[in-house]
């Protein structure tokens, strides 16, 4: 007899750039399972399509569950949107090329989708600098204008059919011209604004082995983006959140950090553009 989970396929959407990115991915943990597949979006970054194709075949030629798309575009959000438009999985998860996946946690999340047809998105626990964030109990996630709800993409498993009309903002994230983070926060906030059913599960699907946004928080491009996100999520109370955030960031001093965050929060045209998306 077939189980409900037999109808749930999971596709991991991997954004990377150049041949070096494929090599990083090959060193990561990519579990094998009959219901699991991987779609790799490799932005050329100056490398030829032929060299990328040859390296992919060398590294993953024996993996029929891993497929490749080569893009001439640039920017993490742009790559994710392209992958989202091409995924075939019932459930999709976005990851970077240096993320290690946990097979047991992926199976648990898949089974949860199978037995909870009303759930659109599962948010899982994340680890930042060795510290777990998210809590130890399952819960329904709702938007809270004071506290906010934030997420990272590799801790979100999402039903493909629930995400119509949603996309990552190309002006945010690695490779963007000005705002070098914030793409996950805005995307997830818009998931909640759309009224999708989001459940939190205290499992860890993925571990990010590379440099995280938290580790480059002092970068002006990241702080600008944090200000933009704070003004979007907390339009009336963002100065309080900005002051608290500035105190936690090491490197440039509280006042300089606060000024940079406030500049991002004051970009009313960009914030209005996000609200129109």
Feature map (PLM): residue ranges:
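N-proximal low-complexity "stem/linker" segments adjacent to membrane-targeting elements
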Residues: 1-37
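Acidic donor-binding segment of Leloir-type glycosyltransferases
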Residues: 26-70
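Glycine-rich, basic loop-to-helix element that forms the pyrophosphate-binding segment
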Residues: 70-87
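Short beta-strand-to-loop acidic/aromatic patch adjacent to the donor-nucleotide binding site
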Residues: 90-100
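Conserved donor NDP-sugar-binding/catalytic core segment of glycosyltransferases
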Residues: 104-136
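Acidic donor-binding loop at a coil-to-helix junction in glycosyltransferase catalytic cores
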Residues: 173-187
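Catalytic beta-strand/loop signature of glycosyltransferases that borders the donor
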Residues: 195-207, 219
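Non-catalytic, C-terminal membrane-associated alpha-helical segments of glycosyltransferases
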Residues: 218-277
């Amino acid at each position: 007899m077939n189980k409900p989970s037999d109808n749930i396929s999971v596709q991991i959407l991997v954004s990377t750039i150049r041949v070096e990115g494929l090599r990083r991915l090959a060193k990561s943990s990519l579990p094998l399972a009959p219901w699991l597949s991987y779609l790799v979006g490799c932005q050329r970054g100056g490398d030829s399509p032929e060299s990328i194709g040859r390296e992919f075949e060398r590294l993953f030629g024996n993996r029929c569950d891993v497929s490749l798309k080569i893009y001439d575009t640039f920017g993490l959000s742009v790559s994710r949107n392209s992958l989202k438009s091409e995924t075939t999985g019932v459930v999709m998860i976005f990851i970077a090329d240096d993320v290690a996946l946990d097979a047991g946690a992926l199976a648990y999340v898949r089974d949860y989708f199978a037995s909870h047809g009303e759930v659109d998105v599962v948010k899982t626990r994340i680890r930042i600098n060795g510290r777990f964030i998210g809590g130890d109990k399952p819960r329904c996630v709702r938007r809270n204008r004071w506290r906010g709800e934030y997420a990272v993409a590799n801790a979100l498993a999402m039903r493909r059919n629930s995400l119509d009309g949603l996309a990552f903002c190309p002006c945010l994230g690695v490779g963007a011209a000005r705002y070098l983070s914030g793409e996950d926060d805005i995307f997830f906030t818009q998931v909640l604004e759309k009224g999708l059913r989001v459940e939190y599960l205290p499992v860890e699907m993925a571990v990010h082995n590379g440099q995280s946004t938290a580790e480059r928080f002092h970068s002006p491009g990241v702080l600008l983006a944090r200000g933009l996100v704070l003004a979007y999520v907390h339009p009336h109370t963002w100065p309080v959140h900005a002051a608290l955030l500035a105190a936690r960031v090491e490197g440039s001093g509280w006042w300089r950090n606060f000024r940079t965050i406030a500049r991002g929060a004051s970009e009313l045209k960009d914030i209005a553009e996000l609200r129109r998306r």
